[in-house]
């Protein structure tokens, strides 16, 4: 989709729909209102209140180059955030598309305390997020109206922001498409192919290890999970050398579980169909690496994705087994449905052994996260307070909300084992998200590491005025912003 920034006046831009973002109590721009013979003033404050997400479509009747004007509510000016502006832009773009628009233009909001670059960035992100259609595999393809061009009305700072927003949105949408793809269409091998294709297109070095390669690396935990599958695992390593490859390296690690049946500890039928999205962390890593490369972030970033599915079979690993992986730590299997932390542990150990200075990992790790936080925020669990705060702030700046969970030493008692170094579950239902995150910390040594548990926010149930049902791409923006800030710290 084409995204352009133009310095044209509101009364000069020739598009199908001109979108005017307005806060509560703010009048429409005087020049547009005058051109429409006072129509905007009649509507604003009457039918249109400016409430968050409210839209009112006006026909210009040839009095403006734009065929229609869409009034878009932002809510109270003091409550507008990067996230709410992004959401409003998505709502506006979808409303314009529903009206048949093929080209749209956004004015920048005037009553909001946000600089031009940031406003253009989050409007662009929101528009491209809202307009994105997830792929389908239907035998009959029905034609659907599509917006082909998005214009932002602003100057050079807006141009910079819109370009940033476009690149990030494309990374998020790539992550959404990957996590939405059915497991039979996206096995570990096919996920590796998609990652390698992205790397080739963006100048990123990539290595893909097959089952034999995983054995040679000593990825015993990944291989244990893979035992019940007919699909071989893959271990994907991507290296973006934005700082010339001299280091220091930031490590991004994503869980690539392409389908999770639960293994022998099999999941209930209800909801199992959706376990194709259990590689949402890996999808976020791939989308982020694309964006990091296209933004030309001046940092060296290593991304690691351990990938397999988790299936029951006569050869599957079993509850009670003791296995070990790259870190050398031994794990007593309490549940084969707690497999994500196993494959991530090998990925994290690899990143740490490769010398990454700091690591962020993301996964749909625990159902307990939904109980703790609901579908609003992801959880952060870490082994280093300072690094956790940096990642938390990066997420906030990128418009992704997290919440820091405790990591007191006593919580490690939850994963103690009498026969191994640790268990892969908990002895009861207490603090499941904390226990899962701290399990991961056991495999990175002293390397500062933050885990994002995105289980409750990686999937949206039901479409609304902003986005379609399906994968959300959460984590992608946090990864990108954290990498950008990591680069700034090197200067």
From Swiss-Prot:
GO terms for cellular component: cytoplasm. SUPFAM superfamilies: Macro domain-like (SSF52949), Zn-dependent exopeptidases (SSF53187). GO terms for molecular function: manganese ion binding; metalloaminopeptidase activity. InterPro entries: Leucine_aapep/pepB (IPR011356), Macro_dom-like (IPR043472), Peptidase_M17_C (IPR000819), Peptidase_M17_leu_NH2_pept (IPR023042), Peptidase_M17_N (IPR008283). Binds 2 manganese ions per subunit. It catalyses: Release of an N-terminal amino acid, Xaa-|-Yaa-, in which Xaa is preferably Leu, but may be other amino acids including Pro although not Arg or Lys, and Yaa may be Pro. Amino acid amides and methyl esters are also readily hydrolyzed, but rates on arylamides are exceedingly low; Release of an N-terminal amino acid, preferentially leucine, but not glutamic or aspartic acids. The keyword Transport does not apply. GO terms for biological process: proteolysis. Presumably involved in the processing and regular turnover of intracellular proteins. Catalyzes the removal of unsubstituted N-terminal amino acids from various peptides. This is Probable cytosol aminopeptidase. It comes from Symbiobacterium thermophilum (strain DSM 24528 / JCM 14929 / IAM 14863 / T). The lineage of its organism: Bacteria, Bacillati, Bacillota, Clostridia, Eubacteriales. The gene is pepA.
